Amino acid sequence: MNILGIDDNENILKLLNTVITMKGHDFTQALNGKDGIKLIEEQNFDAILLDLAMPEFSGLDVIECLKKSNKLQEQKIILFTASSATDKEIDVLLQNDGIKSCIRKPVDINVLINKVEEVVKSS
């Protein structure tokens, strides 16, 4: 699997990189939404872990950008966030074709990896 992590927290990206590569998967990371969009345009990913709360260009901005370019439905996005978004707001986001799940931080890393593998296999 080729997984993209978009998160402004370098420590989280380092942890994800370590665990995901130990499981035998490829991991690419972006520290902000703009870099994440650029990577999505250049490569194909089996899954995208997307933080909602990032400065300057948030996860919501990433989702809107993908919607406008008609690329959202092609993605398998797992919202991975400590955002204060309500369950109702998350439910609205999950109605978008490319958004498959939401996991709130903090999370057991094994639960996260299992969710990523489940989302990838589900299509």
Predicted feature descriptions by range:
Residues K38, L60-Q73:
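Short amphipathic alpha-helix used as the core "switch/output" element in two-component signaling
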Residues D51:
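Active-site residues of response regulator receiver
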Residues N44-D46, N70-I78:
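His-Asp phosphorelay/catalytic-motif detector in bacterial-type signaling
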Residues Q29-K38, G59:
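Helix N-cap/capping motif at the beta->alpha junctions
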Residues E10-T28, N96-D97:
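Two-component/phosphorelay signaling modules centered on CheY-like receiver
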Residues D61, S84-S101, N110, N114:
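Alpha4 helix (beta4-alpha4-beta5 surface) of REC/receiver domains from two-component response regulators
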Residues M54:
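Receiver (REC) domain active-site loop signature in two-component systems and cognate sites
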Residues F80-A82:
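Hydrophobic/aromatic residues positioned on beta-strands within the core alpha/beta folds
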